[in-house]
A protein has these predicted regions:
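Helix-turn-helix repeat elements of alpha-solenoid scaffolds
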Residues: 34-47, 82-91, 123, 130-131
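Terminal, low-structured helical/coil segments at or just beyond the last alpha-helical repeat
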Residues: 140-181
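TPR/TPR-like (Sel1-like) alpha-helical repeat modules
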Residues: 84, 90, 122-140, 176-181
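Short coil/turn linking the two alpha-helices of tandem helical-hairpin repeats
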Residues: 32-35, 71-80, 116-121, 165
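Structural register within alpha-helical repeat arrays
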Residues: 65, 72, 110, 156-161
Length: 181
């Protein structure tokens, strides 16, 4: 009987969403810290590997994997590797958004990455589209999103939306009120 449990448990874990897993919360925090400092990149990647093994190719986990490529591009000193990481991140993120266009975290991750890219890479329109889609999702899926995400994550999304200047101030204010931020 115990042997059967060894096979069922991994399948049961993979069938659930990772959003309520404490390790997923750690992944989110490590990603934001990795954006600010390369010292967090390895712990972020280690956590990402554990979650990928636990949940399989879940869309947001895949997107964080592509975010890791973007971070490697940011911190790489070799220009050829930097270019390779950058273009791999862009292609992978575009493909993930095409597969899951209505996932707010997927849109947030790509939109925040593209926002900081130089204009000559031609990703400004995609970033604006991601932010507008994210706002619409936050406005229309309040109940679902408050169950999936901590206030800290929703606050980061709302703050970033405000920072872009691409969304009317009244909509940003309503978002912050809606999520009690």
């Amino acid at each position: 009987m115990t042997r059967a449990l060894y096979f069922v448990l991994p399948l049961a874990l993979m069938s659930q969403t990772p959003h309520h897993d404490p390790l997923y919360k750690r992944l989110q925090r490590l990603y934001f810290l990795s954006v600010q400092s390369a010292t967090y990149l390895q712990p972020f990647e280690d956590t990402l590997q554990i979650l990928a093994a636990r949940y399989g190719p879940y869309p947001t986990i895949q997107m964080y994997r592509y975010g890791a490529l973007a971070l490697k591009a940011r911190y790489a000193t070799n220009l050829l590797k930097k270019k390779d990481y950058l273009y791999a991140a862009i292609a992978s993120m575009d493909a993930q958004v095409a597969r899951t266009p209505n996932d707010p975290e997927v849109r947030f991750l790509r939109g925040s990455f593209y926002y900081y890219l130089p204009f000559f890479l031609g990703k400004r329109k995609a970033a604006q589209d991601d932010i507008q889609t994210l706002v619409t999702l936050l406005e229309t899926q309040t109940q679902d999103l408050t169950q999936l995400y901590d206030k800290e994550v929703l606050r980061a999304m709302a703050d970033f939306i405000a920072q872009t200047g691409w969304v009317e101030e009244t909509r940003v204010k309503k978002l912050r009120q809606r999520y009690s931020l």
